[in-house]
């Protein structure tokens, strides 16, 4: 089994998260994608909404998307949501699965600042989402890591080896640019605008019913 993992504050979850995840799932032929709300994000400010509210929004989205599941593993920890700790737990939970941690290229270029970042490759593959035509400069310190671990998507045409999941590779997927951000959505909602083009109806319905993000 091949499992994608997309973490985020999801404050709120929107099409800028969902559409790239769908594109990655299709490009790599993943069996499912776990959407994982951060509880205590180490690289961001604390979310506006509670963890319970963000879990609810993500659960609602997953209920409407085939092959997507809510992962609450970080929500159940009262420690910072370090990726390496999460992936170690997931590799124990899915011992025969190949894990694919999905991230933007904007996050990858700062990977060296992450907690025990080199150990991440022992538990999962990375999937880098990038805009078509964008490339990491040869001078960037992460370029060497990318070159050493880069793998072609075509290699996934072979079925995964049961009991011997392969980790440590980096796959790059060109995704359709999404000019959407949670900050923009929160700002719009605060002044009474309804960003119907950015949110799934089920998410917008929950936000309106709970009167969230109002100034």
UniProtKB/Swiss-Prot annotation:
It catalyses: nicotinate beta-D-ribonucleotide + ATP + H(+) = deamido-NAD(+) + diphosphate. One of its GO terms (molecular function) is ATP binding. Its EC number is 2.7.7.18. InterPro entries: Cyt_trans-like, NadD/NMNAT, Rossmann-like_a/b/a_fold. Keywords: ATP-binding, NAD, Nucleotide-binding, Nucleotidyltransferase, Pyridine nucleotide biosynthesis, Transferase. Pathway: Cofactor biosynthesis; NAD(+) biosynthesis; deamido-NAD(+) from nicotinate D-ribonucleotide: step 1/1. GO terms for biological process: NAD biosynthetic process. It comes from the Bacteria. It is an enzyme of class 2 (transferase). Belongs to the NadD family. HAMAP family: NaMN_adenylyltr. PANTHER family: NICOTINATE-NUCLEOTIDE ADENYLYLTRANSFERASE-RELATED, PHOSPHOPANTETHEINE ADENYLYLTRANSFERASE. Catalyzes the reversible adenylation of nicotinate mononucleotide (NaMN) to nicotinic acid adenine dinucleotide (NaAD). This is Probable nicotinate-nucleotide adenylyltransferase. It comes from Shewanella sp. (strain W3-18-1). The gene is nadD.
